[in-house]
């Protein structure tokens, strides 16, 4: 494998593994900023070593073990938290006895809980929505500050500052690295879903720049939504959001004409709609319905989008059902935009 191919592989591995790597480290260290820094250190070492040694059989486990060693080195240098240092030393010794199996357990066993903690921490309500979005894409999406800046068409230093300030705010406020419980989870989940949907919308209908759409952001939001749905299978509104994004994303190829101008929904060539994404969206919507309870705004919007997706032509659209769904949506989230669409 050439150096270029190895670097491409490392980039792909990072996109896949970075979120749970950071999440696992944050669980141990209780410091999201330090966890990301150590994960980045492990990435740098991989970039230095893998072109010579080859990509390991379990690259995620290799990165986790390397990051843990960096954590031990750092604690040894700083002579802080000696008890935690000893704990990490014992853990590393155990991994050396059975590196592959222990590293896999570190990644796979607590993966769900760790990732949920990271999601809820990155989207904490004390952060501005802009900060939540930047931190989420950085920690969970595996994007660099440059990639985030280019996606939102803002200077890279601006994104970097948002991320730095967000991590400082979390540390200063001593935000607990945990999944919220009880009634708090409803409000906190709204914050998470809002951040993911904002990323999707910025890709679906860009608010800046010359391009009407930025598909990369839509893909990042969909990936995050699908992961969250897998981690919270009993949360109907998570499935509602995933259904909404899947169905909306299915129209991407039909939304722009040859000149780059938007095409209204009723004028789109429905043969260009992605039936696979529509199928996924309808399945997510059905899962939300099966879970029962009062439908939230995302599930309602997904149900409206499904009415359009099921119609072979604009003339076959079930406008009666759409009107009824908008009436319910207006009660759940009253807003001028909803009333305008309802009219």
Tell where the protein language model's regions lie, with residue ranges.
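Amphipathic, Lys/Arg- and hydrophobic-enriched alpha-helical face
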Residues: 13-32, 45-49, 120-124, 205-208, ...
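Amphipathic helix-loop-helix modules that constitute alpha-helical solenoid scaffolds
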Residues: 83-130, 138-147, 154-327
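Σ70-family region 2.3-2.4 aromatic/basic alpha-helix that recognizes the −10 promoter
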Residues: 43-44, 57-86
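A short, charge-rich alpha-helical start-of-domain segment used by transcription regulators
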Residues: 2-23, 33-36, 186-194, 198
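DNA major-groove recognition helix of helix-turn-helix
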Residues: 39, 50, 75, 152, ...
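Residues within the DNA-recognition helix of helix-turn-helix
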Residues: 17, 59, 162
